[in-house]
Curated annotation (Swiss-Prot):
The lineage of its organism: Eukaryota, Metazoa, Chordata, Craniata, Vertebrata. Belongs to the potassium channel HCN family. Residues 751-763 have a biased composition (Pro residues). Glycans are attached at residue 291. GO terms for cellular component: axon; dendrite; HCN channel complex; plasma membrane. Residues 354-774 are annotated as: Interaction with KCTD3. Residues 46-91 are annotated as: Involved in subunit assembly. This is Potassium/sodium hyperpolarization-activated cyclic nucleotide-gated channel 3. SMART domains: cNMP. It comes from Homo sapiens (Human). Detected in brain.
Amino acid sequence: MEAEQRPAAGASEGATPGLEAVPPVAPPPATAASGPIPKSGPEPKRRHLGTLLQPTVNKFSLRVFGSHKAVEIEQERVKSAGAWIIHPYSDFRFYWDLIMLLLMVGNLIVLPVGITFFKEENSPPWIVFNVLSDTFFLLDLVLNFRTGIVVEEGAEILLAPRAIRTRYLRTWFLVDLISSIPVDYIFLVVELEPRLDAEVYKTARALRIVRFTKILSLLRLLRLSRLIRYIHQWEEIFHMTYDLASAVVRIFNLIGMMLLLCHWDGCLQFLVPMLQDFPPDCWVSINHMVNHSWGRQYSHALFKAMSHMLCIGYGQQAPVGMPDVWLTMLSMIVGATCYAMFIGHATALIQSLDSSRRQYQEKYKQVEQYMSFHKLPADTRQRIHEYYEHRYQGKMFDEESILGELSEPLREEIINFTCRGLVAHMPLFAHADPSFVTAVLTKLRFEVFQPGDLVVREGSVGRKMYFIQHGLLSVLARGARDTRLTDGSYFGEICLLTRGRRTASVRADTYCRLYSLSVDHFNAVLEEFPMMRRAFETVAMDRLLRIGKKNSILQRKRSEPSPGSSGGIMEQHLVQHDRDMARGVRGRAPSTGAQLSGKPVLWEPLVHAPLQAAAVTSNVAIALTHQRGPLPLSPDSPATLLARSAWRSAGSPASPLVPVRAGPWASTSRLPAPPARTLHASLSRAGRSQVSLLGPPPGGGGRRLGPRGRPLSASQPSLPQRATGDGSPGRKGSGSERLPPSGLLAKPPRTAQPPRPPVPEPATPRGLQLSANM
């Protein structure tokens, strides 16, 4: 090599001045490169074999070591530990353990049968199986001295040869050595087995029982880390979750262990009489099965063992000899233990598959006991049951604890996903900064309200605002028309902005799923995002103006300049959407009621309170008798008023709507659809009723009537709506008397008070109302 390289170098030095000497430079690299081929041939194979002994980068190694860098460090540790050191998480060790596991299970099944039912084991298949098993067990014994050991206590891996040897000699070496003695090799070499007498033969057969100690080696292979590795690989194949895979593996391991114990017990039932040369009182001699085939002997022995283990009998007959008695007791003890273990594991497995539903059932049992202890009425219990069903839907989680254990980015991702429906339907979040949306969502609390619940009570101190995920709610303000809120709306922010009291009541009309934001979290978020405070204040002021109220704090803040043009555009979008939503829900309100016919009806809860409704009907008749108006069959008669106002009464939120026939005078008139007046009754739970008779549209005369049908003056304060006697515009009404938050109607005071100044709204019909207390 040096002789060839030196002339090439000299030629290149001499050819430097001229260009003709450049081509001869090319051959030396080829000659130099072709020289080391014989030495570099085994290097790729050795390198490939070395990678098989090292941990590879996969999901399992990343889970164990944490990162790619940690895996590379572990690979360097294997290289520096010495030659032929096998890492316990390497691919070679994984496949070797899998082969040994299968071979070991085969030995645990085949060896008891061969020892028990076969006297001559010189057949070629039996010899091949024994020799192959002994060879693999001896190789496994040698490889264990070069395989790293996982120290469970310190979560480290021993790779030093001296440390591996010392620890293996102190733990599993003796068991592996005894179970790996090549008895078949000894018999084949010296050919001792044919010349053995009976005692030597029995001794040799007893030595074969030592193979059962390989059960302890099975425990060594079934370490937790390897089980997790198998589970993860099966997850990728069958696309199963970790809980389902672990549950299936646990139940299969338990069933396999019980079947293996039954197999061993059956072989033991026949082995003991065989070692005693089948005494006359043993079950084999009694059943005359000494010379039967091994298949029939094994079947009867297995049936006898399973009968004992399952505690269903003694098999074909009760034990007679003392060895059979002791074997029966042993089988019963083992069977009872396995049965208890199986029941315990199966129960724990079933409970772990649906722990959230089990937790909900346990919680609801406590609720039932609580209701029984306090003797709550049946309707309250039903409401509590329905609340739990809608709130938890059969599953209960400790959501705060689960989210609190996660990292902040993962927690925000989960909250954004679970609240995606709320964000999609709410323009406030659609036009806001994503950081603001995330800040709000992480502080929300989920709540459920039932139909009829007052979410917000007028005049109370506000400590929360609410975002509607699903449901329909009504805003009840004194002297103002109802406003409906549905998915994507929010309410309760006015008192948080002004630090005052609630300006209106909010009632749930359906089951509502809301998210609440406390005042502390509300102020903390708005301090971080001042532009969103401006948006909340703009919408709040517009809502107050729509119900005829004002707030000096909001007006003063409204007069301040806006932070930017984008904020003003967003405020306009929010205000317009809020108005459109209120207008749209009111337009859809009549469709939520019952379908009306052309006949005049009264809407009243007759099904739930027939006696109260009958009393109300009597009061209606009295009111109609004292009404100063045209004849019953004229266009302005009470029958005409009832028929024309049927569709308006369907949208009234005063009470549940049930149709009732108005009277015999209603069947003789066919009336047009446009309403002129509305007559309906509203009942509270306390037994009080209210009858309202609304007058014609603005421009027509109308007079208010008292409880006895007498005309009232405009200054009488017993009516919630104000109207002048000459038909001038007054305060708008919704077509029905608003129930106070308590659900009761107060009696009208007898002392006159000055009337409130009217707020002209000609678009809203005025009405004359009559209140009758039952």
